């Protein structure tokens, strides 16, 4: 599953906007207030239609506060009025077929339902039926969004913090809330660690997740012999490695710097959700799971050296995922091809390639 384009009408700062996406990577750039987060939020609502249509999951729709406002000069006063309908129309590829669906809100008292998104909600219903029948051929797409508050919001209590049952759709719990859900993720790590101990053998999808974390930590630090383990005494992940002085280090992820912690939490959240959604893929779960991951300010807390490689690392670890990200960082922009960059300016998409220099 991936998004091809969005058409926004009366959505926040845009009266009308069309954005096209690369099927592997789109980097959205622009000055403050240009609408980068708005485009990501619209894409989240569009992609999240799939999970919104599933039983027991939150409906992420358009809210009345998302309406675009117009000002009317009435002489002695300026009248500010919300504009309706608010519409997000998406074109995407789902299971190899192009479909179009719309999310809308027709009035301030209206409800952002799913009636106009039937082409995608039918897919969600089909997925649910196939899950109920235990269909091993079903590969569920990851759909996840990470906002600018992801580092500090991740420890908050959330309503979806328990696995009621071993249900594949648990991989979608809180996935569009904008922050890595550490409580839910740690419960999964705890559960997998216990299962490996009881079985006295590795669980392939769990090994794949740990290996991804070890690979990215080694990549951004240059440290060797990196291992990631769940620590049952602290309820945290420990990173074990040899530093550049060959000193053996063991440190909880929670005590790492913001940049390390943000990167590891992001990749861990994506990876463990894939393992929940598609456990039948075993050690291929990270390389075979498709889907859409949206990241606001992908450079958040990262050293410029890491900014140059964060997108490369993400696409190598998750080769079938479409990443739609925003950034201010020149290092991130210069690390990608021009066709992957969308520049927002003057309430629209700016076509001048030199604008990204």
What does each of the following model-derived ranges do?
Residues 1-57, 235-357:
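Switch/communication elements of ASCE P-loop NTPase nucleotide-binding domains
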Residues 91, 147, 229, 240, ...:
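Residues in well-ordered beta-strands of folded domains
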Residues 143-147, 229, 291-297:
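Extended hydrophobic secondary-structure segments that form protein cores and membrane-embedded regions
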Residues 1-184, 201-204, 215-218, 319, ...:
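P-loop NTPase switch/coupling surface
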Residues 158, 170-288:
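Extended helical coiled-coil dimerization/tether regions that scaffold
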């Amino acid at each position: 599953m991936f998004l091809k384009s969005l058409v926004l009408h009366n959505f926040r700062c845009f009266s009308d906007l069309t954005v096209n996406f690369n099927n592997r990577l789109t980097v959205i750039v622009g000055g403050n207030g240009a609408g980068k987060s708005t485009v990501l939020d619209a894409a989240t609502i569009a992609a999240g239609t799939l999970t919104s249509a599933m039983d027991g999951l939150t409906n992420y729709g358009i809210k009345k506060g998302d309406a675009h406002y117009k000002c009317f000069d009435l002489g002695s006063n300026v009248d500010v009025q919300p504009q309706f309908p608010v519409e997000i129309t998406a074109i995407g590829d789902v299971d190899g077929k192009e479909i179009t669906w719309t999310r809308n809100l027709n009035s301030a008292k209206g409800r952002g339902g799913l009636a106009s998104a039937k082409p995608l909600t039918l897919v969600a219903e089909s997925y649910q039926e196939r899950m109920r029948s235990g269909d091993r051929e079903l590969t569920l797409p990851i759909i996840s969004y990470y906002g600018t508050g992801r580092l500090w919001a991740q420890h908050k209590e959330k309503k979806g913090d328990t696995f009621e049952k071993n249900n594949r759709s648990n991989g979608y719990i809180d996935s569009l809330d904008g922050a890595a859900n550490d409580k839910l993720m740690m419960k999964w790590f705890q559960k997998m660690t216990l299962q490996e101990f009881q079985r006295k053998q590795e669980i392939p999808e769990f090994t794949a997740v740990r290996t991804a974390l070890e690979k990215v930590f080694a990549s951004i630090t240059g440290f060797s012999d990196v291992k990631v383990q769940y620590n049952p005494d602290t309820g945290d992940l420990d990173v074990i490695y040899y530093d550049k002085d060959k000193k053996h280090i063991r440190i909880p992820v929670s005590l790492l710097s913001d940049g390390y912690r943000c990167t590891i939490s992001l990749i861990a959240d994506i990876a463990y959700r894939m393992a929940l959604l598609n456990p039948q893929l075993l050690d291929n779960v990270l390389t075979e799971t498709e889907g859409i991951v949206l990241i606001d300010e992908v450079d958040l807390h990262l050293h410029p050296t890491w900014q140059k490689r964060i997108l490369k690392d993400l696409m190598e670890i998750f080769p079938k995922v479409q990443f739609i990200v925003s950034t201010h960082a020149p290092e991130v922009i210069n690390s990608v091809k021009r066709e992957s960059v969308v520049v927002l300016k003057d309430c629209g998409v700016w076509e001048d390639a030199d604008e990204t220099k």
